[in-house]
């Protein structure tokens, strides 16, 4: 499981991205790169990491489900993910 501080930092970044999204879009269209540079660094969407909602793991995360590969496999085998079943051919 990821450290709670890492998860909290990512959540803070998500809030900042949401807060400044409209302003950032406006400045990009106007081409005002100087004002864009003065915005908080963490307000950029590229700074947000997709993390597993259960474990906080940052690698191997299925964006559609919000789960890392280990949790995805566990829940899929237990039948807790509707519409997901093990492939066989």
From Swiss-Prot:
Q: Which domain of life is it from?
A: Bacteria
Q: Which GO terms describe its molecular function?
A: rRNA binding; structural constituent of ribosome
Q: Which InterPro entries match?
A: Ribosomal_uS14, Ribosomal_uS14_bac/plastid, Ribosomal_uS14_CS, Ribosomal_uS14_sf
Extract one GO cellular component term from the record: cytoplasm
Pfam families, per this entry?
Ribosomal_S14
Q: Which UniProt keywords apply?
A: Ribonucleoprotein, Ribosomal protein, RNA-binding, rRNA-binding
What are the transmembrane regions?
A: none
Q: Which GO terms describe its biological process?
A: translation
Assembly and interaction partners: Part of the 30S ribosomal subunit. Contacts proteins S3 and S10.
What this chain does, per the entry, is described as:
Binds 16S rRNA, required for the assembly of 30S particles and may also be responsible for determining the conformation of the 16S rRNA at the A site.
Q: Which family does it belong to?
A: Belongs to the universal ribosomal protein uS14 family.
- Protein name as catalogued: Small ribosomal subunit protein uS14
Species of provenance? Chlorobium limicola (strain DSM 245 / NBRC 103803 / 6330)
The lineage is: Bacteria, Pseudomonadati, Chlorobiota, Chlorobiia, Chlorobiales
């Amino acid at each position: 499981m990821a450290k709670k501080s890492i998860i909290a930092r990512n959540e803070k970044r998500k809030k900042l991205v949401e807060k400044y999204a409209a302003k950032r879009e406006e400045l990009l269209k106007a081409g005002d790169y100087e004002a864009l540079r003065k915005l908080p660094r963490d307000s950029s969407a590229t700074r947000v990491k997709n993390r597993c909602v259960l474990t906080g793991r940052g690698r191997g995360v299925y964006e559609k489900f919000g789960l890392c590969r280990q949790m995805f496999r566990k829940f899929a085998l237990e039948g807790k993910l509707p519409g997901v079943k093990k492939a066989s051919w």
